[in-house]
UniProtKB/Swiss-Prot annotation:
Belongs to the asfivirus B117L family. The chain crosses the membrane at residues 66-86. It is a single-pass membrane protein. This is Uncharacterized protein B117L. The keyword Oxidoreductase does not apply. GO terms for cellular component: host cell membrane; membrane; virion component. It comes from the Viruses.
Length: 112
């Protein structure tokens, strides 16, 4: 099946069937027995092909869902970086506290 891609009035891409494209299944000769069987095969083939391409018929370039998905990913990355920063701060705080306690313990041992 032939398709042309064009922009509609809203600036969105549209897929239209190309009328200049000649499908061998649709070129059936009425006098030939094989052409009749080809024509019988053409309808389900075209229907299945059209149904398969249905989700990709129109691409909306101004769709806000793309930006919503991008925003969600950016928020997840921001939270991940925030958690890494908090974990590093907590680790440094624990390390400094333990170091301070060990130093205080050693100082108290030296005083005895």
């Amino acid at each position: 099946m032939g398709y042309t891609i064009q922009l509609d009035k809203d600036g969105d891409y549209c897929w239209d069937e190309d009328p200049t494209h000649h499908d061998p299944y649709t070129q059936a000769n009425a006098t030939s027995h094989t052409a009749v069987s080809r024509a019988a095969m053409a309808a389900p083939h075209a229907a299945a092909h059209h149904a398969f391409h249905e989700p990709f018929i129109k691409l909306n370039l101004t769709d806000k869902n793309i930006f919503n998905g991008l925003g969600f990913i950016l928020i997840v990355i921001f939270i991940y970086l925030l958690l890494i920063t908090l974990q590093q701060m907590l680790t440094r705080h624990i390390y400094n506290t333990v170091q301070h306690c060990v130093k205080a313990h050693l100082d108290s041992k030296n005083l005895q």
